[in-house]
Amino acid sequence: MYKISCIHPTCRPSLARKTREKWMAYAKHPEEIEYITYFDSFDQKELKKKIWKEKNNVEVYSKYSFGIVKKCNAAAKLATSNCIIVATDDTIPEIDWDEKVIESADWNSEVVLNTSDGTEKFDKRAYMVKTVILSRKRYKKLGYILHPNFKHVYCDNFHTWISHKDDVVIKRKDIMFEHLHPSIGKSKIDQFYLNASTQEEYDYGLKVFQNLIKENFNKFEEKKLFKKYLDESDPHKKYILAYVLLSAGVDEAKLINNSQVSAKI
């Protein structure tokens, strides 16, 4: 059985295969990794073939679908390991990344790993979970890798929020999966990036995000997490709890005022 399943959604076949080569070359034990690349294809021969396998490399060919979400969830159905990682065209791991990931958690439990992606200097949202890495147990509980109501934008925001809400995140910022994102000048802007970055897509993603929070948060959870927030002494953990509560619509003044009272007590 493989220890890690990489699932890689893509509409850029050439770049995806080059990226896959780097992931496997940088792994300490590539033979323990299955790499599933899920392609948007316009080639009728590929579409008829549907799937190609060679050792631990799997390629799946499907008709075009916008964004990464649909392809991620379809690829995950083929994953066999207890640790599932979403690879992307513009994400490159560090040397021996696989060993570090495996040693970072009990992958038989329900867990989400939060690593570094090199954008922290520009992205000040310290709550964001970088690179989607989760256990099979977590995947099975959710029923998806990225919520299927999303197309692309904001899917990582909801992954972050629900992972923190459920308190399954393990912080390992010493592990790097570098995100070569065009917005910080690490790669060139292409048509896919432009299509995924329109105001319309952001508005759609935000609406889905807000609706899903409403569906996944109730007064009981608010009361439980609010008490946890008041009792928490670790500044970072308190910040994360504040993020979860504020995103769910809890009044900021309530957090500040009650936190001050709690500190006095």
Predicted regions and their residues:
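Short beta-strand/loop segment that forms part of the nucleotide-sugar
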Residues: 31-43, 61-62
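Glycine-rich, basic loop-to-helix element that forms the pyrophosphate-binding segment
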Residues: 62-79
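Short beta-strand-to-loop acidic/aromatic patch adjacent to the donor-nucleotide binding site
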Residues: 81-92
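Conserved donor-nucleotide/metal-binding helix-loop-beta segment in metal-dependent transferases, i.e.
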Residues: 96-112
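Short beta-strand-to-loop element that shapes/binds the nucleotide-sugar donor at the catalytic cleft/hinge
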Residues: 111-130
